[in-house]
C-alpha cells in the first residue's frame, strides 16, 4: 500500500559486545560458522555477513584470536584497503564444524528478545486510526468492488 506510516526509529546499533546481551559462546560460534561457510576473511566482510558494526565484530574477532580459533594473515592485497585479514585456525575449523552440527544457523546475529519486543511495541499500529479516505487514497490505483473497502478497513485497522 502507498500509505504513509509514522517514522519508527530502529534501536541503536550495539557499540560493544556487552551491549549485545547474548551469550559470548553463541556469538563466537555464529562468527566462526559464518567465516567457515561464507569464506569471510576481513572484518568488514564479517560485519556485513553477521550484520554488526565493524568495531563490535573486531571485538569478537579479538576474543576468537585469544581462544586460538582465528589467526591474523596480514593484509591481503591492495584491494583490501590495507585491512587485516583473518582465517580460521585448525582448531577454529573444528569448532565451526562442531557448532554447525549443533545448529546450521550462520549469518545475521540474532536480536535479543527484549530488544525485539520493545521494537515491536514501537511499531505497533494499534493506536493508529485509518480513515476510509486514507484507505481509498492508498488503494486508489486498484480496481476494487466498493464493498471491499468497507470490509478491508476494520481488518487493516486491527493490524
Where are these regions (language model features)?
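Dynamic helix-loop-helix/coil hinge segments at AAA+ ATPase domain boundaries and subdomain interfaces
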Residues: 121-149
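Interdomain "pre-motor" coupling segment immediately N-terminal to P-loop NTPase/helicase cores
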Residues: 63-128
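Short amphipathic alpha-helical elements of helix-turn-helix/winged-helix folds
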Residues: 30-38
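The C-terminal cap of the DNA-recognition helix in HTH/winged-HTH DNA-binding domains
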Residues: 37, 65-66, 157
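Short alpha-helical segments that sit at the start of domains
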Residues: 5-30
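Pre-Walker A (Motif I) flank of P-loop NTPase domains
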Residues: 147, 158-159
